[in-house]
UniProtKB/Swiss-Prot annotation:
Gene Ontology molecular functions: DNA binding
Species this protein is from: Symbiobacterium thermophilum (strain DSM 24528 / JCM 14929 / IAM 14863 / T)
Disulfide bridge map: none
Similarity-based family: Belongs to the SfsA family.
Protein name in the entry: Sugar fermentation stimulation protein homolog
Any Pfam family hit: SfsA
CDD domains, per the entry: SfsA-like_bacterial
Cited InterPro entries: SfsA (IPR005224), SfsA_C (IPR040452), SfsA_N (IPR041465)
Length: 251
């Protein structure tokens, strides 16, 4: 899959200090200033956001001055975009997976969805807004939910497995049930787990964190919902959607 998505117009390297709440992180810029930045992901990311971790942030306005303008409804200086763990850069921008998926489908470079010519984001179906509706004259309409994945853990066999969710998500399970209902009505439906890093070898639900989501994922897979996963190649300069990952649903 081709097409890079720039992560920000102005990117600055910094050091992660702390996360006082789910949506704010404090970082130290290279010039020594400590500033709060918005964290778009409400996931815990405890294995990523550790004091001293290198990060990439984007600031509002003039980065040479102390920024004070509000961002995301909070007094934050900008956004946290990426964190490095070991030698791997991980995007924590939750809007990025949807952008990359959208671009890939439009470009015809996302093989599982080749042939779809129209992409409608935020499609209302049932009681939910589904991320995408894909349509084409000779193909069944396809509803797609895109999930952002940042955690990768070793499995029992040593394989590095991307895991979702890293916090309980009743909303995520509800979306899965909506997709299963769509299959019963003649739609094609899929959930795509976009791993925002390139060191995963497979994907599987994180049952220890949210067993209900894991069981729901297995249930909808049996009902005909496609479970797909992809890696993302991330560098400080941008990100490219990569190939598919094997999916491990067995407990």
């Amino acid at each position: 899959m081709k097409g890079a998505e720039p992560l920000a117009e102005l990117r600055l390297r910094a050091t992660f200090l702390e996360r006082p709440n789910r949506f704010v992180a404090r970082v130290r810029l290279e010039d020594g200033r400590e500033v709060p930045v918005h964290v778009a992901s409400s996931g815990r990311m405890k294995e990523l956001l550790v004091p001293g971790a290198p990060v990439i942030v984007t600031l509002q306005g003039d980065a040479s001055a102390q920024p004070t303008r509000p961002f995301g409804g909070r007094k934050t200086a900008g956004r946290l975009l990426m964190v490095r763990t070991g030698s791997t850069w991980v995007s924590v921008d939750t809007s990025l997976p949807g952008k990359l998926f959208h671009q890939a489908v439009v470009a015809g470079s996302c093989a599982p969805f080749a042939g779809y010519t129209e992409v409608r984001p935020e499609y209302r179906y049932g009681g939910s807004r589904i991320d995408f509706l894909l349509t084409a004259p000779d193909l069944p309409p396809c509803l797609v939910e895109v999930k952002s994945v940042t955690s990768v853990l070793p499995d029992a066999d040593g394989a590095r497995v991307a895991r979702f969710p890293d916090a309980p998500t009743a909303r995520g399970a509800r979306h899965l049930d909506e997709l299963a209902g769509a299959v019963r009505e003649g739609y094609r439906a899929a959930v795509c787990f976009i791993t925002q890093r390139d060191d995963a070898q497979a994907f599987g639900p994180w049952d220890e964190i949210d067993p209900f989501f894991g069981e729901t994922l297995r249930k909808v897979a049996r009902a005909g919902v496609e479970i797909r996963a992809f890696v993302t190649h991330v560098t400080p300069e941008g990100a490219v959607l990569g190939g598919e990952l094997p999916v491990r649903l067995a407990r």
